[in-house]
């Protein structure tokens, strides 16, 4: 059975993390990015967790543009995090350190499950198919640690550039691909992982271009300077838009496949053309 993905929950591709212990930057983050992730996991220490929860509860932000990242299910503060979210207008909840089960405390919320444990990778199908899960997001660094590794990316002594992060290792790329495929099969959206070196704008751009053209709904950002880079990556090039317009126009005159500039165009390419135009329209 075909099910449409709930992509309308992601209003734009540039999704910026904001630490929950810094309420002064909440409005700035929402003004810059398409969506903001108010972060209780890495954005607040244990000593200030109550204050951070209150910061989120008191924030007057557009609920359609807010994701709250709670602590993982094994954290002592998980239940209090979820209870706080239920007291707010916010319903999109990002849950880190998922293993195989979605905790019952999340019932009725829109859950973005993080795939960053070996157990979650093995159990992606069940996680993606859970009725409360609307999307998946992955994290390379925690997964690398839990796999017993030391680096999620190739290093200069392995042939990577000296002046920028290398590409992800095969285990990371496999996780990303499996997550994306299982999410699509279950009718859910995906968000691509952060590019940790926010000075590496070219690397961020290249990874975001791949995410956009592969079908991810958005890419996570950890610094405001990454936002426009992501938007630019998700915005189709003029030549792509021109091609898509021609394909869609020509498809009106043919019941099936047709030839355009020496290339055979059939239903999958027509669908891709429509998506290019949708991306271009969404990019404004």
What are these regions (language model features)?
Residues 1-284:
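Expand to "…catalyze enediolate/carbanion chemistry for C-C bond making/breaking, isomerization
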